[in-house]
UniProtKB/Swiss-Prot annotation:
Organism superkingdom: Bacteria
Single GO term (MF): RNA binding
Native species: Novosphingobium aromaticivorans (strain ATCC 700278 / DSM 12444 / CCUG 56034 / CIP 105152 / NBRC 16084 / F199)
NCBIfam families for this protein: PRK05422.1, smpB
UniProt gene name: smpB
Name of the featured protein: SsrA-binding protein
Length: 160
């Protein structure tokens, strides 16, 4: 029988988020991927340190790697500390990797990490998106829509 989940750990705890990704790209599909980390990287992430703002994922030799993500060295670590900007392997099923390879090569899409979080079982996961880049006009449209939503909310708050 499965262990009951404590209510505090029932939801995911986000430790790093790529906020610009939703502005820079059209998000087509999202996936959850495991990530290979060393012990000091896990400890550093549990303290809420880490950044994926400039990172991306790429497929190499049938494996998916998270490139340019920054997990700072663990403050209480010793000589066994990790390298902060090393490429980290993402754990996905072969079928998903094949889909990513096809989409990136044929359709000109990009693999963008949206967030790193710990799931209810305490495992580090990466929310990965298959995305297509926006041009300047699309970005302006996004800004206009966002501003209109804010203005509409402000009007509704003031008048009713």
């Amino acid at each position: 029988m499965a262990r009951p989940v404590h209510p505090e750990f029932d939801k995911k705890k986000v430790v790093a988020e790529n906020r610009r990704a939703r502005f820079e790209y059209f998000i087509e599909e999202t996936y959850e991927a495991g990530i290979c980390l060393t012990g000091t990287e896990v400890k550093s992430l549990r303290f809420g340190e880490g950044s994926i703002a400039e990172s991306y994922a790429e497929v190499k030799n049938g494996e998916v790697w998270l490139v340019n993500s920054n997990v700072p060295e663990f403050s209480h670590g010793n000589r066994f500390n990790h390298v902060p900007k090393r490429p980290r392997k993402l754990l996905l099923k072969e079928r998903q990797i094949a889909k990513f390879t096809g989409a990136v090569e044929r359709k000109g899409m990009t693999l963008v990490p949206l967030s790193i979080y710990f799931n209810s079982r305490g495992r580090a996961k990466v929310e990965l998106a298959l995305a297509k880049g926006k041009n300047a006009a699309d970005k302006r449209t996004t800004i206009k829509e966002r501003d209109w939503k804010r203005e509409k909310a402000r009007i509704m708050k003031d008048h009713g």
